[in-house]
């Protein structure tokens, strides 16, 4: 139905059975400054029309995921800068990702359609291999979260990199669209705090709190794998303060990044073990 609504947006009502369309459709009066800044008017209308229709369906969480993916892709930002755009793009620009002149994105419909079919495909593929195993997701501050009924053989994690990304801001479209609680003031190592000595020390202190907390539920000799960009060499002290031994450190270049720039980026994987 979003396709029909989109056609209604693009053509005068009298050309498309005016009685029918006037009865069922209306433009959304969106005053949200974030959407007005980062999205074209057509995209805004399509996104909020789809959101309005979600409540009529059973699998609402799946539809919200589809819409969230579509909203991320429909922002008026350069194709090569999906993670940290500085400002919206309102005119044609040279795209280093596609190596040609690209235009600002005007619609959300094509992304809604693309991700709908992609999601169906993924669900069908997963259904063929899924087992009776269960997964429990606990949302909380890892410095404080309590996991009293559990014990773990190990951890595999990739914490935020100090001063690199404002993760809440990167996904602001979802916070604004679904009215999620914003806990950006709790974010560890955000770009907004920079990479000063004070910021690095605060980051290190926060990560020590994280691993000391979760260590309470780790079995003896538990294995910990941490994917990091540790150019400041912060993790040896983190391991020491948490009573973890460093078993090995693996290094690798990162070749397929979200940002299509020329910045050389590498990561390390720390293999630690609880003493």
Segments and roles (model prediction):
Residues 1-7, 151-174:
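Internal hydrophobic scaffold segments of catalytic domains
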Residues 52, 167-170, 237-239:
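Short amphipathic alpha-helical segments
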Residues 1-53, 180-193:
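Conserved phosphoryl-transfer catalytic core
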Residues 40-156, 162-165:
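SAM-dependent nucleic-acid methyltransferase catalytic core
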Residues 204-220, 239:
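A short glycine-rich, Lys/Arg-flanked "PGG" loop and its adjoining helix->strand segment in the class I
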Residues 30-42, 197-203, 224-230:
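Acceptor-substrate binding/catalytic loop of class I
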Residues 35, 160-206:
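Mobile active-site "lid"/loop adjacent to the S-adenosyl-L-methionine
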Residues 229-275:
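Class I S-adenosyl-L-methionine
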